[in-house]
Amino acid sequence: LWKLGVTAKTQHNEVAPAQHELAPVYETANIAMDHNQLVMETMKKVAERHNLRCLLHEKPFAGVNGSGKHDNWSITTDTGMNLLDPGETPNENIQFLLVLACVIKAVDTHADLLRRSASNVGNDLRLGASEAPPAIVSVFLGTQLEDVVRQLVETGEARSCLEGSTLHTGVSTVPDLPMDATDRNRTSPFALSLIHI
C-alpha cells in the first residue's frame, strides 16, 4: 500500500474470524476517501492472487460481525489548527465550543442527509438496532463534554469540567489506565472522539 501512496500504519485482528482492521495515517478527506477505495480494490486483487476471497460486504454472514468502511474526519484551518480539539479545559475553549455547537446544529438540521449517506441494506444488516443503527442519527459527546454542554444550556456558562476517570485493572502487574472521557458510543453514528480530554 505504501508503494501506492497509502500510508497505512496499523493493522490488527477484529472480532469476526479472519477479519482485520487497517488504519491509514490521517490526510485530506478527499484523498483519504480515494485511498479507502484503492485499499479495498488492492485487497481484493491480492487475495485473488493467493486463491482467497476478500469479503467487503457489510454483513456477509448472519450472526458474525460485518465489515465497517468509514473515514474519521476533523476540521482544521489552513494553518493546521484543529477546530475540534477541546484542549485541556474545554469549558474555557470558546472557539471549540462554538464549532461544537455548529456541528451539533448541522447534525440536527441535516439528519435526513446523514441518514441517507450512511444507510443502505448492507449497513442496516451489519449494524442492526443494537449497535449503531443508521436509522437513528444521534450525537454522542461523552460524559465530560455532555456535562459542559449541560452547564451552558442550564446556566449560560460552563464553570467546570469533569476529569477523566481511571480504569482500575485489579491486577498487580498491570497498571491502572486513564479512560478517555469521549470514547465512542457504539450506538451513535456521529460520535465525537476528541483528543486532549
Give the label of every model feature segment.
Residues I195-I197:
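Conserved small/polar residues in nucleotide/adenosyl-binding loops
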Residues G5, G66-G68:
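Glycine-centered flexibility sites
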Residues V15-A16, H20-M33, Q37-E41, K45-H50, ...:
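Loop-rich catalytic cores of soluble enzymes, especially ATP-dependent carboxylate-amine ligases
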Residues L1-A8:
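Carboxylate/His-rich catalytic cores and anion/metal-binding grooves
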Residues P189-F190:
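Long, compositionally biased intrinsically disordered regions
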